[in-house]
Amino acid sequence: MVDRIEGLGPLSQSGKTQKKSENNFSEALKEALEKVNDIQKKAEKAADDFAQGRISNIHEVIIEAEKASIALRLTVEVRNRIVEAYRDIMRMQI
Protein backbone atom coordinates (compact mmCIF):
# COMPACT_ATOMS: atom_id res chain seq x y z
CA MET A 1 0.00 0.00 0.00
CA VAL A 2 1.01 3.57 -0.57
CA ASP A 3 1.41 5.76 2.50
CA ARG A 4 -0.31 9.10 2.66
CA ILE A 5 1.82 12.20 2.09
CA GLU A 6 1.87 14.39 5.17
CA GLY A 7 1.49 18.16 4.89
CA LEU A 8 4.36 20.56 5.33
CA GLY A 9 5.07 22.14 8.70
CA PRO A 10 4.37 25.79 9.43
CA LEU A 11 6.26 28.26 7.25
CA SER A 12 6.80 30.83 9.99
CA GLN A 13 9.27 28.58 11.77
CA SER A 14 11.57 28.40 8.73
CA GLY A 15 11.43 32.19 8.49
CA LYS A 16 12.77 32.46 12.04
CA THR A 17 15.67 30.18 11.20
CA GLN A 18 16.47 32.24 8.12
CA LYS A 19 16.37 35.49 10.10
CA LYS A 20 18.69 34.02 12.72
CA SER A 21 21.19 32.86 10.10
CA GLU A 22 21.03 36.27 8.40
CA ASN A 23 21.93 37.90 11.71
CA ASN A 24 24.78 35.47 12.23
CA PHE A 25 26.18 36.13 8.75
CA SER A 26 25.85 39.89 9.02
CA GLU A 27 27.42 39.89 12.48
CA ALA A 28 30.29 37.68 11.32
CA LEU A 29 30.85 39.91 8.30
CA LYS A 30 30.79 43.03 10.44
CA GLU A 31 33.29 41.56 12.91
CA ALA A 32 35.60 40.47 10.09
CA LEU A 33 35.56 43.94 8.55
CA GLU A 34 36.27 45.50 11.93
CA LYS A 35 39.26 43.18 12.37
CA VAL A 36 40.62 44.13 8.94
CA ASN A 37 40.16 47.79 9.81
CA ASP A 38 42.04 47.29 13.09
CA ILE A 39 44.90 45.57 11.24
CA GLN A 40 45.06 48.48 8.77
CA LYS A 41 45.15 51.01 11.62
CA LYS A 42 47.87 49.04 13.41
CA ALA A 43 50.02 49.02 10.26
CA GLU A 44 49.49 52.73 9.75
CA LYS A 45 50.43 53.44 13.37
CA ALA A 46 53.58 51.32 13.06
CA ALA A 47 54.61 53.28 9.95
CA ASP A 48 53.94 56.59 11.70
CA ASP A 49 55.87 55.47 14.78
CA PHE A 50 58.81 54.44 12.60
CA ALA A 51 58.76 57.76 10.75
CA GLN A 52 58.80 59.63 14.06
CA GLY A 53 61.60 57.49 15.49
CA ARG A 54 59.52 55.70 18.13
CA ILE A 55 60.21 52.31 16.51
CA SER A 56 63.72 51.50 15.37
CA ASN A 57 62.99 48.02 14.02
CA ILE A 58 61.91 48.28 10.38
CA HIS A 59 61.05 44.58 10.37
CA GLU A 60 58.09 45.16 12.68
CA VAL A 61 56.78 47.86 10.36
CA ILE A 62 57.14 45.67 7.28
CA ILE A 63 55.47 42.71 9.01
CA GLU A 64 52.50 44.88 10.04
CA ALA A 65 52.24 46.31 6.52
CA GLU A 66 52.25 42.80 5.01
CA LYS A 67 49.58 41.63 7.46
CA ALA A 68 47.44 44.61 6.44
CA SER A 69 48.04 43.93 2.76
CA ILE A 70 47.11 40.26 3.05
CA ALA A 71 44.01 41.05 5.12
CA LEU A 72 42.86 43.62 2.56
CA ARG A 73 43.46 41.29 -0.40
CA LEU A 74 41.53 38.53 1.36
CA THR A 75 38.66 40.91 2.12
CA VAL A 76 38.49 42.05 -1.50
CA GLU A 77 38.53 38.44 -2.71
CA VAL A 78 35.71 37.47 -0.31
CA ARG A 79 33.71 40.47 -1.50
CA ASN A 80 34.28 39.45 -5.12
CA ARG A 81 33.07 35.92 -4.38
CA ILE A 82 29.97 37.20 -2.60
CA VAL A 83 29.13 39.51 -5.50
CA GLU A 84 29.71 36.68 -7.98
CA ALA A 85 27.43 34.35 -6.00
CA TYR A 86 24.75 37.05 -5.82
CA ARG A 87 24.93 37.58 -9.59
CA ASP A 88 24.68 33.82 -10.17
CA ILE A 89 21.56 33.68 -8.01
CA MET A 90 20.02 36.66 -9.82
CA ARG A 91 20.62 34.96 -13.20
CA MET A 92 18.82 31.78 -12.14
CA GLN A 93 15.49 31.21 -13.78
CA ILE A 94 12.61 30.19 -11.59
Curated annotation (Swiss-Prot):
GO terms for cellular component: bacterial-type flagellum basal body. GO terms for molecular function: cytoskeletal motor activity; structural molecule activity. It holds the Pfam family FliE. Residues 1-26 are annotated as: Disordered. It is found in: Bacterial flagellum basal body. Keywords: Bacterial flagellum. NCBIfam families: fliE. Belongs to the FliE family. This is Flagellar hook-basal body complex protein FliE. The gene is fliE.
